[in-house]
Design a protein with these regions (language model features):
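NAD-dependent ADP-ribosyltransferases
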Residues: 1-220
Length: 220
């Protein structure tokens, strides 16, 4: 994958133009009520291995937690998914109690993996932290993903609506998220995974083949 060197002031327009040139018709998916958010820098790993438990992350040496830390994590009173579960969210529930918080998986700063309704065993609801949280007892494999949703255009709009936010750190994050998106597309292509990648704020899907060939951004 090649690089393109850009001045910091040109990054926003370049990312917008690249997304616009790579857009295709929006892929509507059904049967994908479960959401799982992850950072852009971790999304390629999720595509390769699935949504891993803390136990599996350490087993694969993707994390290096101490035995003491693992013991704390296994206390499901403090971390509801413990060592052997993963957290999922469901939106639009109408049975939350007034004192329950609701996790919103729609975010400009995270990648949202949409997981199949029919995943087995069925995730169990756990309202300890959020009223709409569900715990799946194991690893969610990539074949259970129905879509991968991003909202880079929303992040850009937030920057443009508040010019004071368009500092070097924000542009650096945009650059990193864009480059991580390219990595995600390459992993999908190399693994021959037919999972739609959707820019849900812009209302379109991404031509994975086309955009995966785009150069990575390097700021001058």
């Amino acid at each position: 994958m090649s690089d393109i060197k850009l001045d910091r002031c040109d990054v926003v327009d370049y990312v917008k133009n690249t997304l616009d040139n790579s857009k295709t018709n929006f892929d509507h998916v059904t049967g994908a009520k479960y959401h799982h958010n992850t950072k852009y820098c971790d999304a390629s790993s999720v595509i390769r291995f699935g949504i891993l438990t803390m136990s599996e992350l350490n087993k694969l040496k993707l994390r290096h937690d101490s035995p003491e830390s693992l013991k704390v994590m296994n206390d499901t009173l403090s971390q509801v998914n413990g060592l052997n579960g993963v957290s999922l969210a469901v939106t639009g529930l109408d049975d939350l109690y007034p004192d329950e918080d609701e996790f919103d998986p729609i975010s400009a700063s995270f990648v949202d993996f949409r997981v199949s309704d029919t995943i087995s065993p069925r995730p169990g609801r756990n309202s300890t932290k959020y009223g709409n949280e569900f715990i799946y007892p194991g690893v969610v494999r990539p074949e259970e993903f129905r879509a991968i949703d991003i909202r880079i255009l929303e992040y850009i709009e937030q920057l443009e609506n508040n010019v004071s936010n368009m500092g070097s750190r924000s542009i650096e994050e945009l650059k990193n998220n864009y480059n991580n998106l390219l990595d995600m597309l390459k992993v999908l292509k190399d693994a021959n995974l037919d999972i739609p990648v959707r820019e849900t704020f812009g209302g379109f899907s991404i031509d994975k083949e086309k955009m995966s060939e785009c150069p990575r951004i390097v700021i001058k």
